[in-house]
Amino acid sequence: MFLKIKKIPKVNWSSDKPYNFKPKFSTFFFLCFGLTLFGLGEGLLIVSFTGASPWSVLAQGISLNVNLSIGTITLLISIAVLILWIPLGQKPGMGTIFNALIIAFMIDLCIKFVPTPSNYLNQLILAVISVMMVGRGGGIYLVSNLGAGPRDGLMIGLQKVTNLPVAAVRAFLEISVVSIGWYLGGTVGVGTLLFAFGIGPCVALGLFLVDKIFD
């Protein structure tokens, strides 16, 4: 059962170590493909106008209580999360860098070319699709083992410490983050809740499918 997955699978195109800046072509391809899906999903969530992601809600909530912009707060949160990697034994890699570049590019692409659906039902459907895409993309790029993004790295580190399933750890992180953000005044929408409660199972399913297909 995919909800019980407790580690990132290793397949024939997985890198032996995260700190690898000369990976096989197949490893690099799946890293970029996974991050492209991930970024597309993030962009579609924004375009759906059903609510921001949990970490954006946290940034908004903090921004309302301090004299800093949401963008600055987002950067500071990412730095804080990366610092938390140290006691968890997480290491950055090529994927950590490409995570920021590809996802940002895909979000901008979505906002520019994908129109917001005209009715709310279609907006919700788009939000559901976006969460599934982030999960699948996350599963693919994490299996490449070339380094995770800040939040995914925190998830992996906490999973190793707690030995809990990936889905449970990710759900705990997202729900905690959105709860704090909401308490601080951040705006929570249906899409936010779909992401918070759905991303853990979707990432676990993504990992499960990659393992089964390439095993």
Over which residues does each language-model region extend?
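Core subunits and conserved enzymes of cellular information-processing
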Residues: 2-215
